[in-house]
Swiss-Prot record:
Its EC number is 4.2.3.4. Gene3D superfamilies: 3.40.50.1970, Dehydroquinate synthase-like - alpha domain. Its cofactor is Co(2+); Zn(2+); NAD(+). The gene is aroB. The lineage of its organism: Archaea, Thermoproteota, Thermoprotei, Thermoproteales, Thermoproteaceae. This is 3-dehydroquinate synthase. Keywords: Amino-acid biosynthesis, Aromatic amino acid biosynthesis, Cobalt, Cytoplasm, Lyase, Metal-binding, NAD, Nucleotide-binding, Zinc. It is found in: Cytoplasm.
Length: 343
């Protein structure tokens, strides 16, 4: 078992990574939001079971959560425990941050992607109609309990897709960790628990370091967490890939962009593509001409766009990055680099 703490405006968050974690040591007066189909993590605690996926992040479901908290007598001494994937954790963060102006929150992520990404950062949101994350808060959990036991039955494709985020942390923030991931790809795919524990732990340490210095996205430093996501989001929406698969494709596209701009050696692009492939992730995707055009067009609506440019975090070498203003046309070229015509 590994643990660390990170600081923020509300105090300190404890992060624990291991197998068979003793939840009771970290939680007092729990009420639980649990994703449908999961075993009850805290027997006897009042529990509201919800569906997983993006649909849970609605005002209708949020109202249901508020009603549940009121019915069970939740107050500011209560701990809201969120058990599930990233979407449910987002909803729970919003609910905890707004119910009675804030109650204690503990995250128990049950997918690898949620462990290395959504569980840490303090972002909570619900969607408004077709607009994702339109209404949101920053609200840090008191604890994040990454129990690797949940991953034993995670479907293989879903499991593998999360490694795109792990590779991202190494590429952008820690060259030594990137080398470690490259050398331990087989162990990670085999679900070697020692390797997996370190991968989750180090990924969260790196993300926490960013959150500590730019908790509210005011300094531009947190932009580094978007490496691979500018192109990745467009590819995800058009081709229906899993989030991690789309990020993997986006990483290759944005590394190629960095190389063409003279920041990154071409050999690093090829190496990263090889690492992602070794983890079972795509590095390019077949697309129709229409899909290619749609993905390129979506880049124009990226939230980081300012006029005819998009601010993109570019890796300049493993472990180092810069925030660069890139012409939209250049980003569209990057999309076309990883989407090749296949229908």
């Amino acid at each position: 078992m590994r643990r660390f703490f990170y600081r923020h405006t509300r105090g300190v968050t404890e992060v624990v990574v291991g197998r068979g974690l003793p939840y009771g040591e970290y939680i007092e007066r729990p009420v639980v939001l649990a994703e449908e189909g999961l075993r009850p993590p805290i027997p006897g605690a009042p529990t509201l079971v919800l569906r997983g996926g993006e649909e849970v992040k609605s005002l209708e479901v949020l109202t249901k959560v508020y009603s549940f908290l009121k019915e069970v007598g939740a107050d500011r001494s209560t701990t809201l425990v969120a058990v599930g994937g990233g979407a449910l954790l987002d909803l729970a963060t919003f609910a905890a941050g707004t119910y009675m102006r804030g109650i204690r929150l503990v995250h128990i992520p049950t997918t690898l992607l949620a462990m290395v990404d959504a569980a840490l950062g303090g972002k909570g949101a619900v969607d408004w109609g077709p607009v994702k994350n339109l209404v949101g808060v920053f609200y840090q959990p008191a604890a994040i309990l990454c129990d690797l036991s949940w991953l034993e039955t995670l479907p293989e494709r879903v499991y593998r897709s999360a490694f795109a985020e792990v590779v991202k942390y190494g590429l952008a923030l820690d060259g030594d960790f990137y080398s470690w991931v490259r050398e331990n790809a087989k162990a990670l795919l085999a679900r070697d628990w020692g390797a997996l524990e370190y991968a989750v732990y180090r990924s969260l340490q790196l993300k926490a370091g960013v959150v500590e210095v730019d908790e509210f996205e005011e300094r531009g430093i947190r932009q580094v967490l978007n490496v691979g996501h500018t192109v990745g989001h467009a590819v995800e929406r058009v081709l229906g890939l899993l989030h991690g698969e789309a990020v993997a494709v986006g990483i290759v596209a944005e590394l190629r962009l960095s190389s063409e701009l003279g920041y990154l050696r071409e050999s690093h692009v090829a190496e990263a593509a090889e690492v992602l492939s070794s983890l079972g992730l795509p590095t390019s995707v077949k697309a129709t001409e229409q899909q290619l055009a749609e993905a390129a067009a979506l880049v124009k609506f990226d939230k980081k766009r300012r006029g005819g440019h998009i601010y993109i975090p570019l890796v300049v070498r493993p472990g180092r990055w810069i925030l660069e203003k890139i012409a939209v046309e250049e980003v569209e070229k990057a999309v076309r680099y990883v989407l090749h015509q296949g229908g």
